[in-house]
Swiss-Prot record:
It comes from Rotavirus A (isolate RVA/Dog/United States/K9/1981/G3P5A[3]) (RV-A). Residues 82-176 are annotated as: Important for cytoskeleton localization. A motif (pLxIS motif) lies at residues 483-486. The keyword Kinase does not apply. Residues 1-81 are annotated as: RNA-binding. The integrity of the zinc-binding domain in NSP1 is important for degradation of host IRF3. The pLxIS motif targets host IRF3 for degradation; however phosphorylation of NSP1 pLxIS motif is not required for its activity. This is Non-structural protein 1. It comes from the Viruses. GO terms for molecular function: metal ion binding; RNA binding. Belongs to the rotavirus NSP1 family. Residues 318-493 are annotated as: Interaction with host IRF3.
Length: 493
């Protein structure tokens, strides 16, 4: 087990390039970090162990030892993890780059074998080759990869992933790309590698190679917002941001293939890039469709629909002295936009409900309460129209000129009044609302705060480092909004 980790340890002194590339956290002094009880393969050292969340992408793919290096497969520094990473589509040329990288960093020849024979402190006869002493030589070249599926984008991290584990909580799946290359050609490459090994190790090498190279591919798993860590989320002014650490270098390459070309033919450039790289901290916004769905589900769960039959004049989120309407604690760590949407939705529905239904106070039990929760849950789904129609029908609509309408004459605040006029594109609000107008107002309130058609599915921490740098230069990496604060001096003028 952990052949990749052992190979990184023993091969790191072979060349100057190896000294820089093969320094992994698993072979360094252990610095304790919290464990998340997620068992899987660390994609940096390839050992099967308990994982923790990465500083660069907030996904659980790094072990408690390698986390100290703060490396991510989305960095643009050409470290070993980055060199083993390719984005889809996977071509034969990209797979050849992986094979050439393995042969460069982990060669097997008589000179290497003799070097390890001198280094290894054997306790038996020098002529014997124990597997435990020469595990680093039992490194077969396989084309297995841990695949992260970010909706339409797939990222492959190639490595020697040994053993088996349940992948239920893992953000990636292990796939075998041998059929995209050439099965017989890969067999020949490994036969040539093992030809220099002693006979006692050849059988072990061959057994390990065929076992790993013939593994069936797992079905890819779509990454969702629930897969990301919440440990690096910060809440400033009721805006959620995510702290992301990435390794940067000033050197650029046109493609990952050109980077691998320099690893083989221009090692000085790679060494310079590694020695001049730096760790940069990004504070990215966390506004994405996955988080919005999670927040809306939580909001619908904690929603107090009793507010629509109450006589409270303040916004729904500010009610604190009523046992039936108090939700103030829910918004302690929730986005300010979610709170504003909740206030406007419930204020509008309260005005409609009080205008049409003879209801006493917020302690009464009404048939509309479950529909209010459903409306919040379905506010960004395709079922919103059905829910709006059901809610409209419980408000005792009457037929006027062949159309079902409800009365609308209850008091509302000025901000909501102006917003409804903008949605309906009218100068004065009508005293009766049709189903279309009722639905348009609800959708308009939701879309004002969250236009789901323009949101990304996943957080920005899944983007490549180059894109984060570009977004930061353009001022689009953080969520910006205006605070409408009146200046007392300007007001007096």
């Amino acid at each position: 087990m952990a052949t990749f980790k052992d190979a990184c340890f023993h091969y790191r002194k072979i060349t100057k390039l190896n000294r820089e590339l093969l320094r992994i956290g698993a072979n360094s002094v252990w610095i304790p970090v919290s464990s998340n009880k997620i068992k899987g393969w660390c994609i940096e050292c390839c050992q099967l162990t308990e994982l923790t969340f990465c500083h660069g992408c907030s996904l659980a793919h790094v072990c408690q030892w390698c986390i100290q290096n703060k490396r991510c497969f989305l960095d643009n520094e050409p470290h070993l993890l980055k060199l083993r990473t390719f984005e889809s589509p996977i071509t034969k040329e990209k797979l050849q780059c992986i094979i050439d990288l393995y042969n460069l960093l982990f060669p097997i020849n008589p000179g290497i074998i003799n070097r390890f024979k001198k280094i290894v402190n054997q306790r038996k006869c020098r002529n014997e080759f124990e597997q435990s002493w020469y595990n680093q030589l039992l490194f077969p070249i396989t084309l297995n990869a841990a695949v992260f599926k970010f909706h339409s984008r797939e990222v492959y991290v190639f490595g020697l992933y040994e053993g088996s584990s349940s992948c239920i909580n893992l953000p990636y799946r292990i796939v075998n790309c041998i059929d995209l290359y050439d099965r017989l050609l890969l067999d020949q490459i490994n036969f040539e590698r093992m030809s220099s090994l002693p006979a006692s190790l050849q059988s072990v090498y061959a057994n390990k190679y065929f076992k790993l190279s013939r593994l069936p591919s797992m079905k890819l798993k779509q990454i969702y917002y629930s897969d990301f860590s919440k440990q690096n989320l910060i809440n400033k002014c009721k805006i959620k941001s995510r702290i992301v650490l990435r390794n940067l270098t000033e050197f650029t390459w046109d493609s990952q293939i050109s980077l691998h070309y320099d690893v083989i033919n221009n090692r000085e450039k790679i060494l310079t890039a590694l020695s001049t790289s730096s760790l940069k901290r990004f504070e990215t916004h966390d506004l994405n469709l996955g988080r919005i769905k999670a927040d809306i589900f939580e909001l619908g769960h904690h929603c107090k629909p009793n507010f629509i039959s109450s006589n409270h004049w303040q916004p729904a989120s500010n009610v604190s002295q009523c046992r039936w309407c108090n939700v103030k604690y829910v918004f302690r760590n929730m986005d300010w936009k979610m709170e504003s949407m909740y206030n406007e939705l419930l204020s509008f529905i309260q005005a409609c409900y009080k205008s049409n239904v003879n209801v006493g106070n917020c302690s009464s039990i009404e048939n509309a309460y479950p529909l209010v929760k459903d409306m919040i849950w379905h506010s960004i789904t395709k079922y919103i129209d059905q829910t709006i129609e059901k809610l409209f029908n419980v408000m005792n609509p009457v037929e006027v000129d062949g159309q079902q309408v409800i009365s609308f004459h209850w008091q509302i605040d000025v901000a909501l009044y102006i917003h409804i006029k903008m949605i309906l594109k009218t100068e004065t609000l009508p005293f009766a609302l049709t189903l279309y107008q009722f639905g348009s107002i609800i959708k308009g309130i939701v879309n004002q705060w969250y236009d789901v058609t323009e949101l990304d599915y996943l957080p920005l921490c899944t983007e490549q480092t180059d894109k984060l740098v570009k977004l930061e230069e353009e001022g689009k990496i953080s969520e910006e909004y205006e605070l409408l604060i009146s200046d007392s001096e300007d007001d007096d003028q």
